[in-house]
């Protein structure tokens, strides 16, 4: 139910695909990895990396991103399955996304931004 005040989504993401940076207004988000490994990047308002966190199926890490912190997730393993929990009602993902321009740079395309994120990867 998209109007429910408690939202749980089982998410499947594949390595190598682009998952854009986004900001949730008035919503926090929690990630619990069930299979695979997931990177979480905490960003500034322009998309520059401030922090990196790793969640794996073999650890007990759970990450929560408070509102309105810019962030993105990226699979480390070939694929990742994770439970995402957030307060509702549900809002379409695309409406929360933004185009990254770290340090005032020109707009990155998806590949360039993923290359930029690689510089901060913990693994």
Language model features with spans:
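A short glycine-rich, His/Asp/Glu-containing loop-to-beta-strand
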Residues: 1-21, 27
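His/acidic/aromatic-lined binding-pocket segments of jelly-roll/cupin-type domains
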Residues: 10-11, 22, 28-33, 63, ...
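Short loop/turn positions at the edges of beta-strands in beta-sheet-rich folds
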Residues: 15, 25, 34, 67, ...
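Short beta-strand His + acidic residue motifs that chelate non-heme Fe in jelly-roll/DSBH
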Residues: 20-22, 40-42, 63-65, 71-76, ...
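Cyclic nucleotide-binding regulatory domains
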Residues: 39-63
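Double-stranded beta-helix
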Residues: 46-53, 72-123
């Amino acid at each position: 139910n998209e109007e429910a005040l408690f939202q749980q989504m089982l998410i499947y993401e594949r390595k190598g695909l682009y998952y854009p940076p986004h900001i949730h207004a008035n919503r926090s988000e929690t990630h619990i990895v069930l299979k695979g490994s997931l990177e979480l990047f905490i960003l500034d308002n322009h998309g520059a990396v401030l922090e990196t966190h790793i969640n794996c199926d073999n650890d007990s890490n759970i990450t929560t991103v408070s509102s309105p912190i810019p962030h993105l997730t990226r699979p480390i393993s070939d694929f990742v399955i994770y439970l995402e929990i957030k307060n509702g009602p549900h809002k379409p993902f695309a409406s929360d996304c933004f185009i990254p321009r770290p340090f005032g740079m020109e707009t990155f395309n998806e590949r360039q931004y993923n290359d930029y994120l690689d510089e901060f990867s913990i693994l």
